[in-house]
């Protein structure tokens, strides 16, 4: 039986990350730094000897572009790639496109902090982290996890909050714990799973 390997990569820095804007389902591309981060992720995975069988990403360009750059660096652009909005970033609703300082002026520091850091309070017209998990987790369990458990080396390039859903179930974290978990841009996290989908080992390739 092949190893059950799952690699998660948060997209590289986007143009809106750089401008400190709420992004969500808006669709900015990577910055030059983001491109470099994605290529570095591919290089690190190449150094580890990874040969992927399948990859998953969202339908947002910053994640798709990150995946493309990682696979190019690996020389593995021919593998099957599945794209699904289930892996999209949390939808920030009315906050999307606003500078975080502008949002604080409009709604107040405390309210914006609640929207950003609470588990189940959504911003106007948007999703809470709980809502995002409800969208992302079924896709992970039904589509991604079976590939890993079959022994297919699996790569997921997505977003800070959609990847939190995967980390939450893999590491059996509470809502309070997952809220505190930060995923660095362009930093691969490698999970080796047991046959029952529990984590045998984890390796974070940040920096």
UniProtKB/Swiss-Prot annotation:
SMART domains referenced in this protein's UniProt entry, alphabetically: PGAM (SM00855)
Originating gene: gpmA
Catalytic activity annotated for this protein?
Answer: (2R)-2-phosphoglycerate = (2R)-3-phosphoglycerate
User: InterPro entries in the record, alphabetically?
Assistant: His_Pase_superF_clade-1 (IPR013078), His_PPase_superfam (IPR029033), PG/BPGM_mutase_AS (IPR001345), Phosphogly_mut1 (IPR005952)
The record, for SUPFAM superfamilies, names: Phosphoglycerate mutase-like
What molecular function does GO assign, one term? phosphoglycerate mutase activity
Which taxonomic lineage does the organism of this UniProt entry have? Bacteria, Pseudomonadati, Pseudomonadota, Alphaproteobacteria, Hyphomicrobiales
Query: Which residues of this protein are catalytic?
Result: 11 (tele-phosphohistidine intermediate), 89 (proton donor/acceptor)
Instruction: Please name the CDD domains in this protein's record.
Output: HP_PGM_like
> Per the record's keyword annotation, is Isomerase included, yes or no?
yes
Put simply, this protein is called 2,3-bisphosphoglycerate-dependent phosphoglycerate mutase
What's this protein's function?
A: Catalyzes the interconversion of 2-phosphoglycerate and 3-phosphoglycerate.
Spell out the residues of the site Transition state stabilizer: 159
GO biological process, any:
glycolytic process
In the record, the note on similarity to other proteins reads: Belongs to the phosphoglycerate mutase family. BPG-dependent PGAM subfamily.
- In Pfam terms, one family for this protein is His_Phos_1
How it assembles, according to the record, is: Homodimer.
- Domain of life according to the entry: Bacteria
Locate the residues binding substrate.
Answer: 10-17, 23-24, 62, 89-92, 100, 116-117, 160-161
Keyword annotations for this protein, in alphabetical order, are: Gluconeogenesis, Glycolysis, Isomerase
């Amino acid at each position: 039986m092949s190893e059950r390997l799952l690699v998660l990569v948060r997209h590289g820095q986007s143009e809106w990350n750089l401008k400190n804007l709420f992004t969500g389902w808006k669709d900015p591309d990577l910055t030059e730094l983001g491109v470099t981060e994605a290529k570095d992720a591919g290089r690190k995975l190449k150094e580890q000897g990874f040969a992927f069988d399948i990859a998953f990403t969202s339908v947002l360009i910053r994640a798709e572009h990150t995946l493309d750059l990682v696979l190019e660096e690996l020389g593995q652009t021919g593998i099957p790639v599945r794209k699904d909005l289930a892996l999209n970033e949390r939808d920030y609703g009315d906050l999307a496109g606003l500078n975080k300082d502008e949002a604080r002026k409009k709604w107040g520091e405390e309210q914006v902090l609640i929207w950003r850091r609470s588990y189940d309070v959504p911003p106007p017209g948007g999703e809470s982290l709980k809502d995002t998990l409800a969208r992302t987790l079924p896709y992970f369990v039904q589509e991604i996890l079976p590939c890993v458990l079959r022994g297919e080396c699996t790569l997921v390039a997505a977003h800070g909050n959609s990847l939190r859903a995967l980390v939450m179930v893999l590491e059996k974290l509470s809502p309070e714990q997952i809220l505190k978990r930060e995923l660095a841009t362009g930093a691969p996290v490698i999970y080796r799973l047991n046959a029952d989908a529990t984590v045998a080992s984890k390796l974070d390739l940040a920096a």
